[in-house]
């Protein structure tokens, strides 16, 4: 019995050490766009973009997303043009060979919060905030991981010490993350009046980040459904010809009548 208890304790210790090193396994959440024929919740994408703008964009870039990508997905073209015009973009050179600034336009990418990586690390105590353009594809179990990470901040358990400047999060590898808790109830005021709870903001920003990483998902699913339909018709046609046309030829027998 003693050996069995020791073995269980040893296994528990190894499991705890592995969780501390790699982070807890994320639970699975019922994302509305995860079904085979499901599409994005575009109202959630719009709210998620609002969360990104007001909460995340001060530290995290989305260098692969342009303003025009939002047209028809979460905003009208006029809304996106007005949004892009609020930023200043360095352009040029002009006819005199000098750089100049201009209002943003639809073709511009989302602005960078820092001019370079060194500036980003200096502003964040040595930590480098990752680009969020593909974050839900760049992390294992991406959507579930990002949601769990954003909503799982808590006080460290007894016996666990966190270095100053870091914050305890059981889903982050090592359990200590430089990013503080950012989603607090009421942190943003949604335009559509939906209550901005921590869980709601986490769901919405993950929906937005998932769309940013896979903007073609709806088109891909629709194309897959069309191909399945066409191939099903082709299969039925092939089965018909095999059963009623080819089988006659296949079963036909030739008789050789030899005349003496």
Curated annotation (Swiss-Prot):
Residues 43-150 form the Cytochrome c domain. It catalyses: a quinol + 2 Fe(III)-[cytochrome c](out) = a quinone + 2 Fe(II)-[cytochrome c](out) + 2 H(+)(out). GO terms for biological process: mitochondrial electron transport, ubiquinol to cytochrome c. Residues 18-221 are mitochondrial intermembrane. Residues 1-17 form a transit peptide. The keyword Translocase applies. InterPro entries: Cyt_c-like_dom, Cyt_c-like_dom_sf, Cyt_c1, Cyt_c1_TM_anchor_C. Its cofactor is heme c. Heme c binds at residues 56, 59-60, 179. GO terms for molecular function: heme binding; metal ion binding; ubiquinol-cytochrome-c reductase activity. Its EC number is 7.1.1.8. It is found in: Mitochondrion inner membrane. Pfam families: Cytochrom_C1. Binds 1 heme c group covalently per subunit. Component of the ubiquinol-cytochrome c oxidoreductase (cytochrome b-c1 complex, complex III, CIII), a multisubunit enzyme composed of 3 respiratory subunits cytochrome b, cytochrome c1 and Rieske protein, 2 core protein subunits, and additional low-molecular weight protein subunits. The complex exists as an obligatory dimer and forms supercomplexes (SCs) in the inner mitochondrial membrane with cytochrome c oxidase (complex IV, CIV). This is Cytochrome c1-2, heme protein, mitochondrial. It comes from Solanum tuberosum (Potato).
């Amino acid at each position: 019995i003693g050996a069995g208890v020791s073995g269980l304790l040893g296994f528990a210790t190894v499991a705890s050490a592995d969780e501390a090193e790699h982070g807890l396994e994320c639970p699975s959440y019922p994302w509305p766009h995860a079904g085979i024929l499901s599409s994005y919740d575009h109202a959630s994408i719009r709210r998620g973009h609002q969360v990104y703008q007001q909460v995340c964009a001060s530290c995290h870039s989305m260098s692969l997303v342009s303003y025009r990508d939002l047209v028809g997905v979460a905003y009208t073209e006029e809304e996106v043009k007005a949004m892009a015009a609020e930023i200043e973009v360095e352009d040029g050179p002009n006819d005199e060979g000098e750089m100049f600034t201009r209002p943003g336009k639809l073709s511009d990418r989302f602005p960078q919060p820092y001019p370079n990586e060194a500036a980003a690390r200096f502003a964040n105590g040595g930590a480098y905030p990752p680009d969020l353009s593909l974050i839900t594809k760049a992390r294992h179990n991406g959507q579930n991981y990002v949601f769990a990470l954003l909503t799982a901040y808590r006080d460290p358990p007894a016996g666990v010490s966190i270095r100053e400047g870091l914050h305890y999060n059981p889903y982050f590898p090592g359990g200590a993350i430089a990013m503080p808790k950012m989603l607090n109830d009421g942190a943003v005021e949604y335009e559509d009046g939906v209550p901005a709870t921590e869980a709601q903001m986490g769901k919405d920003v993950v929906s937005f980040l998932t769309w940013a990483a896979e903007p073609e998902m709806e088109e891909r699913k629709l194309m897959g459904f069309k191909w399945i339909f066409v191939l099903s018709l082709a299969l039925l046609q092939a089965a018909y010809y095999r059963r009623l046309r080819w089988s006659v030829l296949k079963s036909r027998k030739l008789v050789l009548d030899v005349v003496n």
